[in-house]
């Protein structure tokens, strides 16, 4: 889709990296400096998007089919899967349209292409924002279930969960439309970066607090049964490893994209920043990878959901 470089748009077109560039090599930027540029083949990008699409569709179908999964927690997980599905689907659609236009198989006026690009970018941006929000909502839900266990079902009701879901979707669509319309303003990009950092801090604080409570609980059980300290240390190490993986994946998959937005504001013309801008497709691919990993972390670990998914797949055959 015709744009003047990925730094000129919030999401930009997926043709910011030339297809003729080697998969991993050195490219020259506008100042003549040598840059490390990772080019993602269109086939690989579409394949990852398809895997994410299928995975998240299965999660949505499994939760919709099993009434036992119609709880606030699974409501958030289902919406996270739907957001990831839209992230993958919109990026796949944009890539497919660009390839068809490039090959001459699809003819359209420039104005129509630009409008289509705007619509796809709004869908992509809103699904990204909602995905981050639902990750935060899942963290809050788990926090309440641990620290307010006796009052959990009165605090987190299905009606309240649905209101939160509706608010997230409406806010995501509204703000993404504004972000795309005013993406040339530095304040818009900074708002997105601040939002990402806020979600990262929220998740880190909540999960670290939950880990501390789990360690205290394990220590209390160990003292009650007069067990040795290594049992408590084992729980702490396992919890710390899980927390590191969860937050590490979140940061590694989303961080580069928001670093890209930050550098657009701070150093749009600097040679080093220009080199980073060339890897925009890689940053989008990492977000697609996050959409693949999310169901493995939040959905498929549920035995009830796996049983439902197995029944759905067997019935489809």
Curated annotation (Swiss-Prot):
Lipid group attachment sites (S-palmitoyl cysteine): 315
Extracellular side of membrane: 1-37, 94-118, 184-191, 267-279
Keywords: Cell membrane, G-protein coupled receptor, Glycoprotein, Lipoprotein, Membrane, Palmitate, Receptor, Transducer, Transmembrane, Transmembrane helix
Location in or out of the cell: Cell membrane
Gene3D superfamilies given in the database record: Rhodopsin 7-helix transmembrane proteins (1.20.1070.10)
Annotated SUPFAM superfamilies: Family A G protein-coupled receptor-like
Pfam family name, one: 7tm_1
Topological domains annotated Cytoplasmic: 64-72, 141-163, 212-240, 301-317
Sample GO molecular function, one term: melanocyte-stimulating hormone receptor activity
Assembly behavior: Interacts with MGRN1, but does not undergo MGRN1-mediated ubiquitination; this interaction competes with GNAS-binding and thus inhibits agonist-induced cAMP production. Interacts with OPN3; the interaction results in a decrease in MC1R-mediated cAMP signaling and ultimately a decrease in melanin production in melanocytes.
Family: Belongs to the G-protein coupled receptor 1 family.
Function: Receptor for MSH (alpha, beta and gamma) and ACTH. The activity of this receptor is mediated by G proteins which activate adenylate cyclase. Mediates melanogenesis, the production of eumelanin (black/brown) and phaeomelanin (red/yellow), via regulation of cAMP signaling in melanocytes.
Protein name: Melanocyte-stimulating hormone receptor
Organism: Trachypithecus obscurus
